Each structure stands twice: as structure tokens, then as C-alpha cells.
Amino acid sequence: MDADDSRAPKGSLRKFLEHLSGAGKAIGVLTSGGDAQGMNAAVRAVVRMGIYVGAKVCFIYEGYQGMVDGGSNIAEADWESVSSILQVGGTIIGSARCQAFRTREGRLKAACNLLQRGITNLCVIGGDGSLTGANLFRKEWSGLLEELARNGQIDKEAVQKYAYLNVVGMVGSIDNDFCGTDMTIGTDSALHRIIEVVDAIMTTAQSHQRTFVLEVMGRHCGYLALVSALACGADWVFLPESPPEEGWEEQMCVKLSENRARKKRLNIIIVAEGAIDTQNKPITSEKIKELVVTQLGYDTRVTILGHVQRGGTPSAFDRILASRMGVEAVIALLEATPDTPACVVSLNGNHAVRLPLMECVQMTQDVQKAMDERRFQDAVRLRGRSFAGNLNTYKRLAIKLPDDQIPKTNCNVAVINVGAPAAGMNAAVRSAVRVGIADGHRMLAIYDGFDGFAKGQIKEIGWTDVGGWTGQGGSILGTKRVLPGKYLEEIATQMRTHSINALLIIGGFEAYLGLLELSAAREKHEEFCVPMVMVPATVSNNVPGSDFSIGADTALNTITDTCDRIKQSASGTKRRVFIIETMGGYCGYLANMGGLAAGADAAYIFEEPFDIRDLQSSVEHLTEKMKTTIQRGLVLRNESCSENYTTDFIYQLYSEEGKGVFDCRKNVLGHMQQGGAPSPFDRNFGTKISARAMEWITAKLKETRGRGKKFTTDDSVCVLGISKRNVIFQPVAELKKQTDFEHRIPKEQWWLKLRPLMKILAKYKASYDVSDSGQLEHVQPWSV
């Protein structure tokens, strides 16, 4: 599918939420199967969006069991009943495995209970089993109604009035085992738990020179194991979809001993709980420990993470994902017709899509069938593009071929960090260095940005030099905001001295400006006529050409965690409003998305101009809120959203206007947003996007092999980014037109579309464009 195949219609054809009404409709929301962090955010979004459009929304407690039992298990929800649940793990409405719903009698009871409350729209949050059950229920619905009418439990009018059941699913599962969706609700939070444990284990393992075998959950899906192995640079990983080849025991022991010989003091082996060999026999953690102890004599420990992975606070990513999906689910139910198949709302790249539920379920079952029949390549293919990409990247970075097996290109590729530090930069450098070495290049590290480049702070960097960099925050190479413009002569001299054939720049808006300056200097300095590519890395997420930047997710999690603590403080004090200032320069990404993830009442950003009337409206909104049971407020403000409406001004205005109703406090989060260990998302995004950048450089250098060609075309100076569903290389010359240089932001930003969501979920009226919604797509199998 192309990135553009669901563009919003133009002009009068645009469709807004106001055009959809839920009046007279009743929506039932339930969570079923294993719990997952973020389910509460989804429940909150469904309830609030449902109420916003005028529908009645009911909680169905304890999953399908509550639907079968009826009575107090089905209760109407109101706005306040989903307050303060965003930051809570698990599901507040409970989940239970239900045998009764598997029988027709059970489903008959469930139908009767729903009809008593007029519910003909179901929003099911759960795994493939729960969603398959919902689809069967929908198919049987008319038959169940007729049976209830024959039994005298409902009249003929009710059969006609409630003739159709609409079902929309959201996949809540930490395993990420549902085909058709890139990320299921809960997966990112589970990765956070795993990486927290791995980071903690690494310190003790290094102290004692130990080997740790970590078993992670995921049933028959290796996603958690694979991505956590990628995020922590594990020595070996065992997956159900890609079993190790015959003789793996010896290969693994050789790999572990080689790593020890390179002065690595610890080994990490990650095992998926469903790991198997090529004969479909289980590979257990204990078996691996036994092997390492007997063959190598290493001090080895096994850690089984278990249900820790299901627990804890949802990550910012899961809260935003679940909120987006919950809103999309309500819109899908409002737009459903009797002919619409049951669908799943999901994420494809950065794009919300609807997919036919049974197509997804079928493909998910096909993966298991392929594994049972030992067609492992098919299993990886069916898991999708993201899974296959992660697997290939892991293999490239984990296993170093002997030097004599790597064909040398005689090319020197330099890596530089530019701008402010961002968590994940080191993961990106590690990935670039290792992929470059595997491709036969000589890799050079430039220290301290363009300043260091001009001074000749350049050294060769090897495979082992970047070991253990993935989990390190900040920038090990050192980074500065200095632009190359005033050092062009010196930098050209260094390019010539070190025979640099290509340049990879990892950084923020300064890196983008630097790339433009180097590109413009090509006519004067032929040394710059080499392939140059930039990978966006900044907490501000303000680089043109990419929807995401390395470091923004970690900053968002820092903001979200801090807001959770502040909200807790405000809840204890009662009648208190907090004003939080976030970073980002003129870019409101952190304030807006932080507001969505933390459940803020307002977020002031530069991209949406505001005046004193808007501030007054916010005060009135908070005054009304204090009359309810939720007696606290949270307001986010981007640091450069307004020259005059500063954080101090807003604090003073709120303090004065709120006198006698609420008091006010302010917090400036500052540079804590740039620090800390990178989140799993930033580690993996940095790792994968940097590997892609090096593949591009290698392909460009192959064009010139032996010919000494100079690169002068625009397509040899690019920014690599994610746009909607695709990873794309865009020439900086083209991106100039899309850039607001004065305010250092792109002219168009995708996340502004989500701005109304934050307002709606905070009880403001807002105009939400739903033109992109409504296209039911088909699941596309991907070929490896």
C-alpha cells in the first residue's frame, strides 16, 4: 500500500466528527483475555468519545463473563468514571476467561443482557481469541434474537429495532502477536519492563563476569524477545519463528567465548517462552544454562521475567496509541452499516487504519500453522515487514564475520553527532558503525560535532568500541550546536586528510542546517561531493522530512512520568492546578503529545495561536471541573509558544482568576527531558534507521567503485525519516520548501491532526477531521 492511498478528500468533501451523531445509540465496552498496559486509556477514550458524540456508553465488567452474567456487570459509564485511569496498568473493568461464552447458551444469555440495555455496538479490547469470539457473536446475532423472541424473552419489535450488532476490536496484548497491526496496546510498556530489568541486570553481571539467560513472555510469538534483544544488544536470542540452525549449541558457545575474549564482562541471552528448535522441540532457559555451564564453565544465572511484563504504568506510546484507537473505534461504530464486516482498528506505520477482523485472525492463525509445519520463513513473512526487518537488523549487528570474510571497499565513512543530546543517539552510532564494518567500510568517529570536525578530532572506531552503547543516554561522541558554515575550509581539509568518502550526521535541526550548508559549499569545495545523509535525533521532533526523531519518545516518557507524579500531588491537595513547561523550541510536539498521554486539561503551543480569551476559557473550564469529583488540573505549555504569555504570566493569571476556587503551582521540566536511559522505542528506532542510512551510503558508494565519481546531485544529500507508513530518503534541497527556518519547524506537522483529540478527551468542544477514517483496508501479506 502506498503512503498516499488514503489522503483526505479536498474541500467540501472533508468529513468532520460533528457530522456523526451517536444519539440513540448504546455502546458496550469490554476488556477480555490477558490484561495489557494501556487498556484503561482505550476504555477512557471510548467512554469519553462516546459521550461526546451523544451515545450512551456502558462498561461490561469482567469481559465476556460479565456479559453472560448480566445484572450489575453491565453499568452505564459517565465522564468522571474514567478519570485518573490513564496512568493505571491492567484494566479497571476487569477481565476474565469465560467458558460459558464459548457455548451457544452462554451467547444467548449475553445477547439478552445486551438487549435489555439497548446495546447493539460492541467495542472489544483483547487478543485474537476475544476478537474471534466477538465476530462469532455478531454472525449469530440475528439467530439469537429470533430464538429469544421464540422463547418470549423479547418481542418482535425488539428483533427489528436491534437487528444488527456492530463490532469493532482493539488489540490489547503485550505479545504483539496479531497480524495486520504494527503495535498492539501493551507491547511498548512490556518492552519498558523488560529493558528496565535488563539494564539492572547488566550492572550485576558486569561486576561478576556472569552470563544471564532471560526468559520473556509472548507465547508463540517472539516479538518481545527479538525487540528486547535488539534494544539491549544481546549476544544471542531464541525465537519460535526463527529457530537456530542445527549445531547451534556449538555456534552459541563460540560466540559467547569470542565476546569474552574481546574484554566483554557479561553475556546476555534472551529466550522467548515459546522458543523451539528446527524439529519443533522446546528450547528452555534451563537447557541453555546447562549448556553454557558444561561447555564454557561460565557463572550463569536464569531470570524468568513472568508477569512483571504485564504490570506497571503504561508508557507514553501505549497511552497515545490506545487513546487514538479508542476514538477511532467509536467513529467506526458510528459509521458502521449492516454490511460492514467486524473490523479491527490498528496502527500501520504512523497511520490509523481499519482492517477486517477475520482477515487478521486468519493470518495470525496462518503463522502458527506455518510454525507447526516447520515453514519458518513463511512464519517470519506472515509476521509482517516490521518483524522481518527487526530480525535482519539483529543478525547484522550481533554477529561479526571474521575480517578475512568481509570484502573491503577501501571507503572511509564518518559518523558525527550534531545539536543537543538526545537519548538513542548512541544506539544509532553503534548500529551505523557495525553495519558499516559489515559492509567492508572503514568507520571514523568525529568527536564534539562540527567544532571537533574542524579541529581534526577524528578516530577510527571498531566493532567492539561500540559494544554496550545501546542503553547509554546522551551522546558518547559528544555533540555541539555549532554549524559548519564558519569552518568550511578546515572541515574540507579534514575530509581530504582522512579521505572521507561519505558522511552520516545524527542530530537535530542544527544537523539539518549543517547538511544544507555543506551541500551549498559543494561548488567551492569538491571534498563535500560525497554521499551525505542525516538521521533525525532531537527531543523536539522538529526536523523536516520525518514524523519522528530519535529521543522524542524518551522525552515524552519523562514528561508523562513527571505529570503522573504531579497529578498525584494535586489529587492529594485538592483544588490545585499545575502548569508545566516543556521543551521543544517552537515545536509543540512534546506539549501536545505529553498532554494527550498525561490527560492534561490544556496544552498551549506555538502552532495554534492563542489569546487572553483562550486563557480565560481554560480558567472557566477548570472552575467548572472543580465542582465535580475531579478537583485538580494539569496544563502544559511549550517553552516558546508565546513571547508574552509566559509560564509566569499564565501562572499569575490562573492564580488570580482562580482565587477561592483553586490554587496554582508551576513546574519547568528543563533539561531532564534530554537525559535518562533511552526508551525501547528510541533504542530500536535509532538502531534500525541508522542501519538503513548505512545501507543507502553503501549503495551510493557502489555506484562509484573504481571510478572516483563526484556526487553533485541533490539526491546524494538526504534526510532519512519516517513519513506515514514508509521510511524515505528526501533530498534536503526539496525539504527547504517545507521548512519554517525562522521558527525551526516543518511547515506541516502530522501530530496537529491529533490536537482535537486531546481537547475532546479533556471535555472541550473541538472540530476533529475524520476524513482519513472509514476506509476499510485489507491485510497485505509481505514477502521477505
UniProtKB/Swiss-Prot annotation:
Highest taxon, organism lineage: Eukaryota
Task: Please tell me where ATP binds in this chain.
Answer: G34, R97, C98, G127, D128, G129, S130
* GO process terms (BP): canonical glycolysis; fructose 1,6-bisphosphate metabolic process; fructose 6-phosphate metabolic process
Q: Which residues cross the membrane?
A: none
Sequence positions bearing N6-acetyllysine: K395, K486, K688
Record entry for activity regulation: Allosterically activated by ADP, AMP, or fructose 2,6-bisphosphate, and allosterically inhibited by ATP or citrate.
Quick one: where's region C-terminal regulatory PFK domain 2? 412-784
Q: Which cofactor does it need?
A: Mg(2+)
Residue ranges, annotated region (N-terminal catalytic PFK domain 1) = 1-399
Phosphoserine PTM positions read S6, S12, S21, S142, S386, S783
CDD domains (UniProt xref): Eukaryotic_PFK
* GO cellular component term of the entry, any: 6-phosphofructokinase complex
Residues noted as binding Mg(2+) in the record, renumbered to the chain: D128
Residues bearing the modification N-acetylmethionine? M1
Q: Which residues bind beta-D-fructose 2,6-bisphosphate?
A: 481, 538-542, 576, 583-585, 639, 665, 671-674, 744
Where does the UniProt entry place glycosylation sites? S540
Residues bearing PTM Phosphotyrosine: Y651
Subunit structure and binding partners = Homo- and heterotetramers. Phosphofructokinase (PFK) enzyme functions as a tetramer composed of different combinations of 3 types of subunits, called PFKM (M), PFKL (L) and PFKP (P). The composition of the PFK tetramer differs according to the tissue type it is present in. The kinetic and regulatory properties of the tetrameric enzyme are dependent on the subunit composition, hence can vary across tissues. Interacts with ATG4B; promoting phosphorylation of ATG4B.
Family the UniProt entry places it in: Belongs to the phosphofructokinase type A (PFKA) family. ATP-dependent PFK group I subfamily. Eukaryotic two domain clade 'E' sub-subfamily.
> Which PANTHER family did the record assign?
ATP-DEPENDENT 6-PHOSPHOFRUCTOKINASE, PLATELET TYPE, PHOSPHOFRUCTOKINASE
Its biological purpose is as follows: Catalyzes the phosphorylation of D-fructose 6-phosphate to fructose 1,6-bisphosphate by ATP, the first committing step of glycolysis.
Protein name in the entry: ATP-dependent 6-phosphofructokinase, platelet type
Originating species: Pongo abelii (Sumatran orangutan)
Gene that encodes it: PFKP
